């Protein structure tokens, strides 16, 4: 799975939220400054070529929908982050956030419970 550029990820976030959308429905959901319609149309076509989106035709207008789930992309992105920055070590990643005080004790406990329940 390819890593997406920042604007591509923003567009995919909109599709994952809306499920299906025409290009004109995507633009208001994107952060400012709003890109031009043609720019969004180009990026949507690129996302379709990369295998992230597909479309259904309504005459000469296309409604697009994601074929890669948010969860699948998140998993791939997290594997890349852990590989690139934490030497493939999830404990190192968690330790980093704990040391930076980005994770509270209650959040750490919640993570431990999630890990325990996923092992069952």
Residue ranges with predicted function:
Residues 9-14, 25:
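Pre-recognition alpha-helix immediately N-terminal to the DNA-recognition helix
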Residues 41-45:
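Short, hydrophobic-biased segments on the C-terminal half of alpha helices
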């Amino acid at each position: 799975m390819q890593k997406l550029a920042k604007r591509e990820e923003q567009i995919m976030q909109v599709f994952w939220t809306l499920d299906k959308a025409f290009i004109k429905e995507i633009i208001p959901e994107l952060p400012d400054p709003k890109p031009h319609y043609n720019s969004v149309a180009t990026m949507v076509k690129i996302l379709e070529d990369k295998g992230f989106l597909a479309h259904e035709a309504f005459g000469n207008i296309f409604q697009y929908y994601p074929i890669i789930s948010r969860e699948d992309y998140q998993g791939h992105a997290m594997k890349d982050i852990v590989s690139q920055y934490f030497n493939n070590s999830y404990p190192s990643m968690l330790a980093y956030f704990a040391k930076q005080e980005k994770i509270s004790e209650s959040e750490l406990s919640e993570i431990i419970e999630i890990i325990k329940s996923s092992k069952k």
